[in-house]
Amino acid sequence: MKRSEFYFELPEELIAQEPLEDRASSRLMILNKKTGEIEHDIFKNITKYLKPGDCLVLNNTKVIPARLIGRREDSGGKIEFVLLKRISNNEWEILVKPGRRAKIGSKFVFGNGELIAEILDTTEVGGRIVRFYYEGVFEEVLDKLGEMPVPPYIKKKLKNKDRYQTVYAKYEGSAAAPTAGLHFTEELLEKIRQMGVKTVFITLHVGLGTFRPVKEEVIENHKMHEEFYIVTKEAAEEINETRKSGGRIIAVGTTSTRTLETVADEDGYIKEKSGWTDIFIYPGYKFKAIDGMITNFHLPESTLIMMVSAFAGKENIMRAYKIAVEKKYRFFSFGDAMLII
């Protein structure tokens, strides 16, 4: 299958640059994957499309302020790190720019010297392995010195760090937010629970690989990045109970979808499990775990538009995206939402 089959024209002004004042006031497109029928609504009305006995599966990862701006210890030259993956207590895999300044053995200073980094090695994808030196707790140092690593297509500075977190974010480890969850408020989640819909939490730490473009023209040749996930015994049991009783499993976001499809058996039952997933879902994939998906509007030719095309049908998705552009829906991380059922 060709990458170009997932291309669509997107005017730049439709790329949302900041979140709306009220999380739940974003627009909602409802796509029926069987009939291709489309409805338009507001996210706070999502309860109209849920039924008692359904189960929403949400990703409770928390974004860390993974972007660090510092200087080279000897020359003072500016450097930017983005933390990707913790390897051990003090060692991380990072992205760095400019790369020419980050030679093995070189050291960098952040803040007033509260954090020092030494380059240990290079990675296959042009990143680096670094060791950090600091006093106290690393997370506290990072919270003081780091910035939120908002996606490259967002040019405005984020006024409030919390708006790039879901209201239920709990476990630190992501370099990007699971953005489908940004639309939920505490009040809306409570309303959903009161109508007899379960909310179950799993964890997948989102890596920056989620923004990595597909470079292969034949998409089957694309190598997917790895992300760490945790599905607890309690979460697996709750989801499996819903499956047994005939309720629908609705994944909130592509990250929840990736996790559930990774740990599901052939009958769609979920196992308690943790580990790394590099699952790549594109048209032709047979879904085992989910009956519905809440997601944002994704980049042309991205692995995410390929995943939603696998779930709803490529023709349905490309037509829905064309309508979304015509109706001026807001796209990407701070944009509007789609419910596929």
Curated annotation (Swiss-Prot):
Biological or metabolic pathway of the protein: tRNA modification; tRNA-queuosine biosynthesis
Record carries keyword S-adenosyl-L-methionine: yes
GO molecular function: S-adenosylmethionine:tRNA ribosyltransferase-isomerase activity
HAMAP family: QueA
Record localization: Cytoplasm
Alphabetical list of Gene3D superfamilies matching this protein: QueA-like
The species this protein was found in: Thermoanaerobacter sp. (strain X514)
An example Gene Ontology biological process: tRNA wobble guanine modification
Cross-referenced InterPro entries: QueA, QueA_dom1, QueA_dom2, QueA_sf
Protein's job: Transfers and isomerizes the ribose moiety from AdoMet to the 7-aminomethyl group of 7-deazaguanine (preQ1-tRNA) to give epoxyqueuosine (oQ-tRNA).
PANTHER family: S-ADENOSYLMETHIONINE:TRNA RIBOSYLTRANSFERASE-ISOMERASE
Ranges annotated as spanning the membrane: none
GO cellular component: cytoplasm
Protein's name in the database: S-adenosylmethionine:tRNA ribosyltransferase-isomerase
